[in-house]
């Protein structure tokens, strides 16, 4: 069981693509549009029952939405958190889709991680 928390229009599109790919394989994660980084929706997070929490954001990993979610669940041993976003490195030039894929934000990469870790 898995929930994907996506923050940002492009991240939501990537996460939805991963859900479609997983659905073709019989895996059906929940997908939540997080809509904003702060304040965190504590009520939503407290109600998550899935053991695997995947965040997808069109943002930097350090100090981003996923970092806040990981911090929130740091003491909760029943949850594993995986963050998909941009690493702390120079990102080259190119089309947005190409750059997101290069940074590991492709629907295929997200789906592969989830399929391997559920």
Regions found by a protein language model. Give the residues of each.
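Thiamine diphosphate
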Residues: 1-118
């Amino acid at each position: 069981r898995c929930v994907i928390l996506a923050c940002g229009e492009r991240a939501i599109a990537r996460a939805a693509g991963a859900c479609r790919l997983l659905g073709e394989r019989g895996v059906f994660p929940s997908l939540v549009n997080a809509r904003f980084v702060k304040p965190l929706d504590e009520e939503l997070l407290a109600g998550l029952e899935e053991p695997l929490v995947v965040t997808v954001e069109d943002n930097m990993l350090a100090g981003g939405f996923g970092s806040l979610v990981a911090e929130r669940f740091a003491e909760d041993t029943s949850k594993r958190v995986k963050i998909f976003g941009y690493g702390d490195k120079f990102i080259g030039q190119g089309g947005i889709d190409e750059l997101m894929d290069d940074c590991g934000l492709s629907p295929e990469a997200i789906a592969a991680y989830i399929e391997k870790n559920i």
